[in-house]
């Protein structure tokens, strides 16, 4: 099999390695961890052998635990946000005029580190079931420093 374009061939990890439901994360079963078996010729950020997280609805299953997704469907790569994305703790968010303040959980940006306090404009973010949020680094105006 030769995977083409921006497609990722993947396999679900075992159930005991999947996100767990908690009091704050009641929709954990919507997200799945998968091992990347192969990638298409237009996939640059994800590599064979990586562990990725994505919504189960974005997996095109070809059997019970293997399938395909697009590189755009990936939320986390090896427990880090995709390139130029920042994972924030939405529960500590505070509004300051038109900007919001939040604490960074994880970042793939060179300028923003885990634990930084950032100020950003709300918009095209991706809210996860555990009430954390993935946003583009272009939404961030500044960090406390």
Where in this protein do the model-derived segments appear?
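Acidic-enriched and Gly/Ser
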Residues: 1-145
């Amino acid at each position: 099999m030769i995977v083409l374009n921006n497609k990722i061939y993947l396999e679900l990890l075992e159930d005991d390695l999947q996100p767990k439901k908690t009091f704050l994360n009641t929709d954990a079963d919507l997200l799945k961890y998968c091992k990347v078996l192969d990638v298409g010729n237009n996939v640059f950020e994800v590599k064979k052998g990586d562990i990725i997280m994505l919504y189960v609805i974005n997996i095109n299953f070809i059997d019970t635990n293997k399938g395909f997704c697009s590189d755009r469907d990936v939320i986390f790569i090896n427990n880090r946000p995709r390139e130029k994305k920042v994972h924030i703790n939405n529960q500590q968010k505070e509004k300051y005029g038109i900007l919001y303040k939040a604490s960074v959980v994880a970042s793939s940006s060179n300028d923003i580190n885990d634990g930084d306090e950032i100020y950003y404009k709300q918009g095209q973010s991706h809210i996860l079931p555990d009430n954390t949020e993935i946003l583009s680094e272009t939404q961030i105006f500044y960090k406390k420093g």
